[in-house]
Amino acid sequence: MYTKRIVLFPISIIVMLLLACQSVTNNNKSEETDDFTLSSIAVSNGELLDAYMCETKVNDVENSIPLSWSNVPDSTGSLAIIMYHYPNPNDTSSVNCYLLLWGIDPSVTGIAYGEADDGDWFMGSNKDGTAVSYTSPCSHSAGMHEYTIDLYALSETPPSLPTQSTIEVDYTVLKNAIKTVKIIDIASLSFSVVTE
């Protein structure tokens, strides 16, 4: 009987230590920073406000959607943005792209309305490949159209990308370049445009 107590005592201590370690681990998880998030004052209740649709072109350039984000991961070396839309939701092989940005410093926390082409970063082609610009949603077909903006937290700016804005960088070029570096996290914002 005495021997059994000696054996059980160390075992009970080990169990208590394991439970204590588990508690510490769980507490550490709950203290992690909030999620990496992307938002826009141009979006309300999941829909793009009318004021930000069908922007007027001036020299083939349109005012860009305002964006803001928070909780960029600490290890981020560079940010990139892609805004896109599938004309046919059932066919993701065909995509229209509305905003392409790369080389954004991780200290940046947003882009003001109309300022996407005027920051310390680089911009790719518009939807039609005719200019370095943002393209605003302006569908002429009736129905609901969904758009998505992905904000990439990257380990570094993809070295294959040019260090200047150019129409040579389209959706495919930027997506493929992003795949060559570590993607730390992605913050996404999706919204709809309803046309009659």
Placement of each model-derived feature along the sequence:
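Bacterial N-terminal signal peptides that target proteins for export
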Residues: 2-9
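Intrinsically disordered, low-complexity segments enriched in polar/charged small residues
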Residues: 9-10, 103
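Hydrophobic helical h-region of N-terminal Sec-dependent signal peptides
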Residues: 11-15
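C-terminal motif of bacterial Sec signal peptides marking the signal peptidase cleavage site
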Residues: 17-20
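N-terminus-centered regions that define maturation/targeting leaders and the start
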Residues: 22-196
